[in-house]
């Protein structure tokens, strides 16, 4: 249940992806429902109180908490739609998959489902009538969730307002539009093992492992995939790519992962979307807003403890940047970036993040930085950080060459070291994002 995107056979966008963002300058509002029936906000549904007199109040409250931990809203909320009603288009390499309606509407949602059918969907990827569900629904991770927790999630979903809405039909390339092929995918790649605690580890570590590898489904985004959308062997949490964003490495690699982050740093990031190292944008903004800001301090810390125990990914050698690109990039940075991030790249703590030794900026694949500069982003909001700040798009102002140069400069300044950015890659991404081109190229004034 996460906001995804370009995942292979469409594995969902990772719930606990740590996406570091380079800056924020303008306020942006979260999309609001288009219909009066949606007066209850997604955050309101996640914080709603339940009467203790109800026979299953404790189970429903637990389900409400687990739905937040699984970040269900981020995927099952389309722009302008009602929470949990689905209809969000997941842009996968194989076509579009639309998320389902999981409100208790009997005709278009899951109101006619039994708890057994719901468990089978979560555990085996099977629909109400036994049909195979596409792995855009991350059952490869949810199958590790206990039956007790699945039943609690189902109990909470049954308390939601029923929304009569049918999402559009999927638009997948032949032959992937035949669900029978998913069965073959499951045979090849689906891990049949349920979650097992490690007796050699602490209770806190095991709780973190349960969340990261189960409801949190972090690997859906942060583990690289093969051509069929399955996890690459022995590369858990070493970074992935989806919907023209990069989900960074979450291992202990000190340059491109979480090696320089403490347990407290990770927990703070999950609570507020900001810490001394980074701020959450892209798909991670929704994870903060609808998921990790709602879970307990203890669970955020458990996740952090587990992530800090992951072995570092292999080091990646970076080629030296061209001196001309660095010189041009420095000039562009001074004009377009330094007002927020300062000339020395230190930014302003927990407002405009520092750019030096930034893991996301040094990822082997620079698509995330290119996307950030071209399209801008918003930061996730939370109770502790309610201001909906964002970084504006520079597509209107900077040419592809200028974006390549300033990206190369940022990726190789203040202790950073990463491969140069190719102008052809920026041009290709601009086309994919359908962003305007710049009319002038001197970068000396209004365009």
Where do the model's predicted regions map?
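N-terminal type II signal-anchor transmembrane helix
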Residues: 2-39
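C-terminal structural cap/anchor segments
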Residues: 330-371, 387
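Extended, polar beta-sheet/loop recognition surfaces of beta-rich domains
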Residues: 270, 291, 356-405
């Amino acid at each position: 249940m996460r906001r995804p995107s370009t995942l292979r056979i469409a594995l969902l966008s990772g719930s606990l992806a740590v996406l570091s963002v380079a800056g924020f300058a303008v306020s942006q509002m979260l999309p609001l429902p288009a219909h009066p029936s949606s007066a209850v906000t997604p955050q309101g549904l996640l914080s709603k109180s339940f009467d203790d007199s109800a026979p299953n109040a404790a189970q429903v409250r637990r389900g409400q908490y687990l739905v937040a931990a699984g970040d269900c809203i981020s995927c099952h909320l389309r722009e302008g739609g009602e929470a949990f009603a689905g209809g969000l288009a997941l842009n996968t390499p194989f076509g579009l998959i639309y998320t389902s309606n999981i409100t208790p509407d009997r005709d278009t949602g899951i109101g006619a489902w039994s708890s057994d059918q719901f468990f089978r969907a979560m555990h085996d990827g099977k629909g109400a009538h036994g049909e195979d569900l596409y792995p855009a629904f991350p059952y490869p991770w949810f199958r590790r969730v206990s039956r007790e927790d699945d039943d609690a999630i189902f109990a909470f979903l049954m308390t939601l307002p029923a929304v009569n809405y049918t999402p559009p039909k999927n638009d997948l390339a032949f032959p992937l539009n035949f669900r029978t092929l998913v069965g073959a995918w499951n045979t090849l790649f689906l891990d049949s093992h349920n979650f097992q605690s490690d007796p050699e580890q602490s209770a806190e570590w095991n709780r973190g492992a349960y969340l990261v590898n189960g409801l949190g489904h972090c690997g859906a985004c942060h583990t690289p995939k093969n051509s069929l959308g399955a996890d690459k062997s022995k590369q858990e949490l070493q970074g992935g790519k989806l919907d023209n964003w990069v989900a960074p490495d979450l291992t202990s690699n000190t340059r491109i992962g979480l090696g320089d982050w403490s347990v407290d740093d990770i927990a703070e990031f999950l609570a507020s979307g900001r810490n001394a190292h980074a701020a959450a944008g892209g798909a991670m903004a929704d994870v903060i807003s609808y998921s990790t800001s709602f879970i307990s301090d203890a669970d955020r810390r458990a996740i952090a403890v587990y992530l800090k125990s992951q072995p570092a990914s292999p080091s990646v050698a970076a080629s030296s940047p061209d001196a001309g690109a660095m010189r041009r990039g420095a000039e562009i940075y001074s004009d377009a970036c330094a007002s927020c991030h300062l000339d020395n790249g230190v930014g302003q703590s927990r407002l405009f993040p520092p750019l030096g030794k930034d893991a996301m900026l040094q990822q082997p694949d620079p698509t995330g930085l290119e996307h950030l500069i071209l399209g801008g982003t918003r930061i996730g909001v939370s109770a502790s950080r309610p201001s909906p700040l964002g970084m504006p798009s520079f597509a209107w102002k900077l040419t592809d060459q200028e974006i390549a140069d300033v990206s190369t400069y940022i990726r190789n300044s203040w202790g950073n070291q990463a491969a140069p950015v190719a102008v052809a890659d920026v041009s290709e991404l601009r086309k994919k994002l359908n962003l305007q081109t710049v009319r002038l190229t001197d970068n000396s004034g209004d365009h």
